[in-house]
Structures are given as structure tokens and as C-alpha cells.
Amino acid sequence: MSYGLMIAVQFDRQDIFDRLWRWGTKYMQHQEGPLKGYFAWSCKTDGTRNSQGPASDGELYYVTALIFASNRWGNDTGINYLAEAQNILNCSMEKDGTNRVMPFINVEHKLITFVPDIHGGRFTDPSYHVPAFYEVWARWANDGRADFWRECAERSREYLHKSIHPVTGLNPDYNNYDGSLLGNNRIIGDAFRFDSWRVPMNIALDYSWTCADKEWQQEYGNKIQDFLYSQGIDTFVDQYNVDGTQVKDTLRAGEHKALRHSLGLVATSAAASLMCTHEKSREFVDKLWNAKHEPYEDGYFDAYYDGLLRLFAFMHLSGNYRIIFPEK
């Protein structure tokens, strides 16, 4: 839902944005109780919640999309977008662990949590880190926390440095706030899997919006493309250990456990070309351009994740994923 809001505001589709927002507040957002202000992370199309709990990256995108909506359309057309963004931030930052619910930004580490509760608040997810979003909040959220959000942006960039393997450019799905592996011996956690695909695209976004960490980001972009290229630009798979070795266990997507040359990773590795300085970056863009969004050989089709990452990558590479400044 929060991805849909971001896409709608980027394409100046207020009609779609408002319909999505109203549906989300009706069926997904908690209006009272310990989770007030947060959104259930998954719902059926009839509004039934698959889970009550939030996923912190959802709130990250909700807030940023609402601020952009405020900048683009103002706040007097039926929805006060800025007030809604501030409400999410205020509701979150007022939480203190009561009923096991926490802010979605860990206030000690100034880093986003995996889930804003007592368990999920102990660690983070590299793919949730979009430092440029905090810069947007610092500039336009008007919630009295501008300095805090700027520090969150800096901490997030520092954290990413620690989370990326120095040779392969790969990162784990989840890790500790200091960038170290969880070491939990579970299939999801220490390896580069589905969540991790988003990291190249997110770092490219920070590069293109802020240029606050330019040299490291260029090195990172070259590094991860070099690794994937070494695996075969048409054959690299979607799950690796962070050192580039083959995973012992394959995470299931669809009915079959299979390593695939997934469109989602084809897309985000192409988006990384925004910050790359080597010639092979053009090949990654060409591969995305010519890739088809269709079922894999085993019949699995991912409309949601592959589809949205493909769209976001095209938005990045075409110059249509931008900071939206206030209308004058």
C-alpha cells in the first residue's frame, strides 16, 4: 500500500493516491490501542487483516509519500496529508515499550527497526534503510524533530557501510544495529535473499537524491554489479551467502524451492547503474529493458514483488523518481 502511494504521488495521480489512502486508513491503520497510528502490514483485498502488526518500512514509505503529497497538492483538497504524516510520526515516537510496542525508529541507535515491538526492535533489515527519506522528513515534516531525522540519515549511511560485504557488495536480509550478522542459523537472516534485493535500489536513491555519500556509493554500485556479472549477467541467482558462496538452504517463493534469475533482482541491480562508473552498468540496464515480466519455467509468477521492483527501477532510470518540492 505504501509503495502504491509513493508511485501515485510520483506520477501526480491524486485520484489514485486518495483512494489508496482512504482504503488504507479504513482497513489497515490502527485508530486506537497500543498500535495506534501503525498499519497492519498485510491485508486481503476485502480488508481482512492477515496480521495485526506493522512492518517498519511501511511506515517509512507512508510518511514520505504523504509529505510529497502535501508538497505537490497542498492540504486543503479533502485530506490533510501533512497532518497525517505527522500523526504517524507522533504516534510512533510517543510509544515507550508499553504493551511491547516501540517506535519504528530505534531511538537509541537512530536506526529503523525490523518490526516496532520488543522482539523485532532488537534488530534491523538493510533493505529498510533509505537515508534520503529522513532528509525529506527533516526538511518538510515540521514535527519538531528535524535534527533527529538528519542524524538518522547519517546513522543509516554509516550502518550500511558496516552491513555490506567488502568484496561482493552483498548484505544479509536482517542483522544487528552494528552491522554484524544475527547468527541465528535460520533460513531468513544472515544470507542475501528476497528482502536484500531492494538494497541496491535504495542506495541508488540516496545517491541520486542527496549525493551525501557519493564515493562510497559509487564503489558499492560497481562492487555489487561486478559480483553479479561474475555469476553471469543472464544467470545470476536470487539467493547467496553474503560472501558470494551458494546458500545451503533455498528460501521458498511459490510452490517450488528454486534458485531463480529473478526479475526483481535484475531490476534493482539495473537501478544501481545510476551510481556506477564502469561500462558494464549499461548491460544491466539493457537486461532490464529486455526482460519480460512473465511466469518462470516452474510456473511461479510474482506480480507484487517482481512487478513493483521493476516499476521502481524504471522510475529511477527514467528520471521519474524524484524529490517533490512544495508547489510555489
Segments (PLM) and residue ranges:
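Aromatic-rich peripheral "rim/lid" segments of glycoside hydrolase catalytic domains that contact
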Residues: 314-328
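Extended ligand-binding clefts on enzyme/binding-domain cores
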Residues: 36-37, 51-57, 79-267, 274-282, ...
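Alpha-helical scaffold elements that line and support the substrate/ligand-binding pocket
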Residues: 5, 63-71, 130-138
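N-terminal carbohydrate-binding/catalytic regions of secreted carbohydrate-active enzymes
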Residues: 1-59, 65, 72-75, 195-196, ...
